Amino acid sequence: MKNLLIISILLISLDVFSQEKFETNKQGSEYKFKVLKDLEATDVQDQGRTSTCWSFSSLSFFESEIIRLKNERHNLSEMFIARNAYMGKAENYLRMYGTFTFGPGGAFHDIPWVIKRYGIVPEEVYKGLSYGSATHKHSEMEAVLDAAVKALAKKPQNGKLTPVWKIGIEGILDAYLGELPSDIEDFNFTYQGKEYNPKTFSKSLGLNMDDYISITSFSHHPFYSQFVLEVQDNWAMQSSYNLPLDEFMNVMEQAIMKGYTFAWGADVSEKGFGYRDALAIVPEDESTIQKSGKDSKRFNDAGAIRVSNAFVSPVKERNITQEDRQIAFDNQETTDDHGMHVTGLVEDQNGTKYFIVKNSWGESNDRDGYFFASFPYVKYKTLNIQVHKDVLSKDLKKKLRIK
């Protein structure tokens, strides 16, 4: 009788194992990923030919937060964020006499910066497509805005700025992205049968922008302190909390396991970043990866073509240290390329863990716009993350002086 019981338990265990869900990165791949956690997210979007990944990724993160907090699904307007951030960039640029950053890039904390000041609207209310295109293309608008702020910085009229310079910049943004009233509370719209303006709609979502923090890991500043991450797109000069690498990785892993997604900023120009192959890895021998063509950073094409068996069969990856990470940042091999959204966690047949990453380049690979980023890749090439502060343990909050 005892033997029969043991056999029954073994058979049940085998049946459960055979039914266990495994994923792979692409057709024909030998990678087998066991799903450890797969959190809800809204539909994959396409940023088009724009450098607004920071807006797409952070808003995707906040859309998942709304699902987590209220079990509601909303598609929020990335171009409403980008448009209002442009005004902030223009003002900063001119206050610094044209010596500061002005451009289409941005950072995760720009989204709270905009929402606190202007609110937010659904995508259907403000699509940002007023130039006869079905997809986002900003090269002309970027050129016009750049020329305008550079001209203003020279103060051509009596050596000072006129009171209407902001109206001029707003006029350019109105033309390309769509008009907004000068008082944002006058922008009234109906959504799902209710009347809102951007601020009342923002309030209805149940998000407290003060609950969200940026975290990074670099040794050129003291750990457990805050510092302004030295990347060009950090125009608002906002700070990130600095953690040792192992703790940083633990925060990311525990966030997912606790049910929290996070926005992820990273370098995506490495040989091992194979979006077409739905895989980001750091092979111990990178010479096995052949790369042809040029990476179009931040845009919605997959960049250079990468060919390697490493994308179809697991290979040994580098053991990334804090020093490796710092050297790559200091020598500018690691660059501030792209914002994405981490929504889950998997483990391959060799025990290596990977984050599930939602991109904003449309459903343009075998994973319908998602890919898997190995822990070594994330250790090596992460710039920073945006996450809810309650992901942190009480002890870590105390160390960082977060209430």
Question: What are the residue ranges of the model-derived segments?
Answer:
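Bacterial Sec-dependent N-terminal signal peptides
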Residues: 1-20
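Generic hydrophobic-segment detector
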Residues: 3, 8, 33-36, 43, ...
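Active-site signature of cysteine proteases
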Residues: 20-22, 167-403
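Extended low-complexity acidic/polar segments
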Residues: 1, 99, 107-108, 116-119, ...
